[in-house]
Amino acid sequence: MCDEQDLARWAKGKLSRRAFGGSAMAAGVAACTPIDSTGDMPEASGGLSEGMVSFAAPGGTMDGFFVHPSGTRSPLVLFWPDIAGLRDSKRQMARRLAGEGYAVFVANPYYRDVAGQQFEDFADFAGNGGWDKARQWRSKLDAEAIQADARAATGWLDTQDGVDRSRGIGTQGYCMGGPFTVWSTAAVPRMKAAASFHGGGLVRDDATSPHRMLREDAHYLIAIARNDDAKEPEAKVTFREAAEALGAEAEVEVYAADHGWCVPDSPSYDEAEAERAWARLLATYAEAL
């Protein structure tokens, strides 16, 4: 999981705003048009409908970016971003997944404190006090809060025309969003797949540790950064053993890349390993949803 030392190093090195890689941005760039909570969404490029949405949730008014194939119903995916929150790189990732046939909601995890996008990209987050701001917002996001948010989000999204309610739901998360996927799956019975990419805190010493909240009928894709694994090499073993004891299907793997490798605006982005992880995500959803 990224920490203050990482952010200080990236900021001191004048982290550049990297151009998005071609394959990661294959869905193309479309404008993010704000819309109201009725779900009336404008047409975007590539046969997708997209926009910002908002709805009532336990912590106030939850908002996020919703994109789905136009004119059809698709399996729902709840997308939890990393510590830098909702921003263009996450919208682009959501568009790419929607292009594969999914209705994708990128949550603003900090809606209890702020609405919408707070940072332009990871460089903006790392260089302009993002850690100090996000640390306060993130402190409210325990298992109980995330589970309440997951229930609220999926409940509202299930009322939207673009969502196929007969299919299972997937959830994916990055960095701090990794454990959110397991908590969400524990809270929403129709969630059938949880994918964590360079997620932190998947094994903890409390009752709400994600490895203690697995479901027998769900699929788990746990993609671990090599530098995170070096800090906690036993965590992958503990998670895998917990899944095996329950009989849950879990793919747990350490990738040959550092924390943040899946996110195009991260200083650790590794296109080859990101594409490999993306392929495993699609395979997991194809099997489970």
Where do the PLM segments sit?
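N-terminal cap/lid segment of alpha/beta-hydrolase-fold proteins
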Residues: 38-69
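Gly/Ser-rich "nucleophile elbow"/oxyanion-hole loop immediately N-terminal to the catalytic nucleophile
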Residues: 122-170
